[in-house]
Amino acid sequence: MTKWFNVGKIVNTHGVKGEIRVVSLTDFPEERYKVGNTLYISNEKGGEPFPVKITSHRQHKTFDLLTFEGYGNVNEVEQFKGSLLKVPEDQLGELAEGEYYYHEIIGCNVVTEEGEALGTIKEVLSPGANDVWVIKRPKGQDLLIPYIDDVVLQVNIENKLVTIHVMEGLL
């Protein structure tokens, strides 16, 4: 059975020429939405995702706008509103050392270098220069950890464990 990963959500159409407005859920939108790539649409009703080939991609405000081969007007893409864009696991590709997919990081337990448990990574934010990991703490407010070498000391994906150095003012 194929394992699928969400890379975007179709939230609306854009214009009359078949463009769709996508909220990106992928780590690498410029790579994932490249012209010629194949994505899979999974509608809200379930069922097996079906392939579509990207014929154009551009960014508009906070959205990615895509068109697909064979879908040239708004009436043909209207049916996709609310659907998810997916890729199979074999399309994920290899990452460089020290790079991780969001789904690998989310759910990892976070401990200090002294072994104190801080919580679990629940979300990854990409505000600018580096990612920020949102740690759900057992009690209290969420903790924001920058993904930089000075803070993140070790990431063990197999054991779902991240070890961090607590810099002054971080907690």
From Swiss-Prot:
Subcellular location: Cytoplasm
Listed InterPro entries: PRC-brl_dom (IPR027275), PRC_barrel-like_sf (IPR011033), RimM (IPR011961), RimM_N (IPR002676), RimM_N_sf (IPR036976), Transl_B-barrel_sf (IPR009000)
GO molecular function: ribosome binding
GO biological process, one term: rRNA processing
Domain PRC barrel: from-to ranges: 97-170
Domain of life: Bacteria
Swiss-Prot/TrEMBL keywords: Chaperone, Cytoplasm, Ribosome biogenesis, rRNA processing
Gene Ontology cellular component list: cytoplasm; ribosome
HAMAP family: Ribosome_mat_RimM (MF_00014)
Entry note about domains: The PRC barrel domain binds ribosomal protein uS19.
Quaternary organization: Binds ribosomal protein uS19.
Annotated protein name in UniProt: Ribosome maturation factor RimM
